[in-house]
Curated annotation (Swiss-Prot):
It comes from Xanthomonas oryzae pv. oryzae (strain MAFF 311018). GO terms for molecular function: double-stranded DNA binding. It is found in: Cytoplasm, Nucleoid. May be involved in recombination. Belongs to the RdgC family. The keyword Cytoplasm applies. This is Recombination-associated protein RdgC. The keyword Cytoplasm applies. GO terms for biological process: DNA recombination; regulation of DNA recombination. NCBIfam families: PRK00321.1-5, PRK00321.1-6.
Length: 301
């Protein structure tokens, strides 16, 4: 259940989530209809075993999950059938259908195929820190994160969440760290980075499994390249890649964090899940607060 990526948003800590359990059922995921392309809504964080539980809260952490069902209609299949239909009409009527007629034919084909299309299920998990006013979405896609915000907005009626905004350029901070400026306490460099020439269409350099402080990196910095992605390690607990878009990718929970689970005395699957949720939420909070200070992240009003 550990998150692998984090797209973060901020929201005012004054928001009231006390009625969340009564607000979610009306916006629960419904099966995609025969003539629908997709469906979105909330599902249980615990999966099929507890379908009626649409949220999970431990102290100031709230776990929500947005589920999706999407019809799979490969474009190649639709286009192949469309060309066959167009050929039939051309042979029968002696003329090739124009643009508008082709569009109507394509719409009719999709309408005909939808009830028989396969359905792909998906889920996107999110943790809301009600004390510090941020939401961490388990995705590296901004669009996926915005979709989760939209679903929460639909449930609450209003949810003024905004993407993270840094008061200083993240690229400048990341470049400074790799150039030798002191990192925040507990943070150290990993072995991966991406550097770009700031001019449009400039060169891009990607380094992996490499010492990030050395002559080779220095030459790129001297040439004016700036760091756009940087691998970092937080104590012995987390490793991740931070981008200048403020998205956290390749998040991994290390032994320093996982060892805490081995000392848990709780038994049972639900107790183990709660222990993992508590650990993950606390580590993400620690990381967020560190980055909030280092990058001067704006608060939500």
């Amino acid at each position: 259940m550990f998150f692998r990526n984090l797209t973060l948003f901020r929201f005012p800590t004054t928001l009231d989530f006390s009625q969340i359990d009564t607000l979610l059922p009306p916006v629960q995921l419904k099966p995609v209809g025969p003539l629908e392309m997709s469906s979105r809504g909330f599902i249980s964080p615990f999966g099929r075993d507890e379908q009626g539980v649409l949220s999970h809260r431990l102290e100031d952490f709230l776990w929500l999950t947005v589920g999706g069902e999407d019809k799979i209609l490969p474009g190649a299949v639709v286009n192949d059938l469309l060309e066959r239909k167009v050929a039939e009409i051309e042979e029968k009527e002696g003329r090739r259908p124009g643009g508008k007629a082709r569009k109507r034919l394509k719409d009719d084909l999709i309408h005909e195929l939808l009830p028989r299309a396969f359905v792909k299920s998906s889920r996107t998990d999110a943790i809301l820190d009600l004390q510090h006013g941020y939401i961490a979405v388990n995705s590296s896609s901004r669009k996926s994160g915005e979709n989760v915000m939209s679903e929460i907005r639909g449930a609450l009626g209003s949810f003024p969440a905004l993407p993270l905004n840094a008061e200083v350029a993240p690229r400048a901070i990341l470049t400074g760290w790799i150039a030798g400026e002191p990192l925040p306490e507990g943070l150290s460099l990993g072995e991966e980075c991406e550097m770009k020439d700031p001019i449009e269409g400039g060169a891009v350099v990607k380094c992996q499994h490499q010492e990030l402080r050395g002559d080779e990196i220095d030459k790129h910095l001297e040439a004016g390249k700036q760091v756009t992605k940087l691998a970092l390690v937080l104590d012995d607990n987390l490793s991740f890649v931070l981008g200048d878009d403020l998205v956290i990718r390749k998040l991994k929970f290390l032994d320093g964090a996982l060892d805490q689970l081995e000392h848990s005395e709780d038994d049972g699957a639900r107790a183990e899940l709660d222990a993992r949720f508590t650990l993950m939420s606390a580590e993400i909070r620690r990381l967020f607060l560190l980055l909030e200070t280092a990058l001067k992240l704006s608060k939500a009003e």
